Amino acid sequence: MKVRASVKKLCRNCKIVKRDGVIRVICSAEPKHKQRQG
């Protein structure tokens, strides 16, 4: 999980979701693409 000021989709499988007020990127194809804004 990378913590970044700016989260972006890194591939076409990445999805942007908002959980508890935190924007996250989840990716089914490449777990290394997981990100959290903070």
Swiss-Prot record:
Description of how the protein assembles with itself and partners: Part of the 50S ribosomal subunit.
The keyword Transcription regulation appears for this protein: no
InterPro entries documented for this protein: Ribosomal_bL36, Ribosomal_bL36_sp
Protein role: One of the last ribosomal proteins to be assembled in the 50S subunit, it contacts a number of helices in the 23S rRNA, acting as molecular glue. The simultaneous presence of uL16 and bL36 probably triggers ObgE's GTPase activity and eventual dissociation from the mature 50S ribosomal subunit.
PROSITE patterns the record matches: RIBOSOMAL_L36
GO CC terms: cytoplasm; cytosolic large ribosomal subunit
Any one GO MF annotation of this record: rRNA binding
Source species, domain of life: Bacteria
Protein name per UniProt: Large ribosomal subunit protein bL36A
A single BP term in Gene Ontology: cytoplasmic translation
Keywords for this protein: Ribonucleoprotein, Ribosomal protein, RNA-binding, rRNA-binding
Pfam families given in the database record: Ribosomal_L36
Keyword Metal-binding: no
Protein's organism: Escherichia coli (strain K12)
SUPFAM superfamilies listed in its UniProt record: Ribosomal protein L36
Stated family: Belongs to the bacterial ribosomal protein bL36 family.
